[in-house]
Amino acid sequence: IVAKIVGVFLTSSDGILIVGASPFSRIIAKYLMKNGRRVVVIDRNEISVEKAKADGIEALEVDVFSDDLNENVELNDIGYLYAFTGNSSINDFAIQKYSRDFGENGAFRLISEEELINDSSIPAEGVFSRTDDFINLSEVVRDFPLIHEVELNSEKHFNSSIDAINKEPHSVPLFIKDKQGFHKIITSNTNLEIEAGNHLIYLGKQLNI
């Protein structure tokens, strides 16, 4: 915490902490790492952590309910928090516990099964996707474990592409990558400024968009 406050070690807070080491978390982590981001994955399941490490991902065995990461100076460049477990209680708790120290630039969680059924209960901010819960995302990764990039030529192109992806059950929109290579999470309540040359990043079945 001291390091984060005084900036002794911190050069930038663009690292990402992902709670949960499922196949969905791992494919997201590998993509972001390939694009130059530092990603740390935590999970209380030893086997899942070992699978992440085997994929070349920095991973720690951590129980969010009992383990404290706030004093870990090796995580002082983390500024984004993604809670991607299949347990909504763990996701909610992780956001509450870690967002102050590791989510200063953004903290996002998966929606619960109940929120998927009753979308009026989904908060306006802080969710990774408003249309896909852990089960849906896991099925997409199982059947189509691929991430695609589409170069956009206009905001109209973005809107038509999002519509096409949302209509395809086996595809999920993830990020907008700007010209500087920075990734912004797509949610239906996000006001994104789209420019020609931006890239739309999506998971799953490849579409002609």
Predicted regions and their residues:
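Cytosolic regulatory regions of ion transport systems
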Residues: 1-209
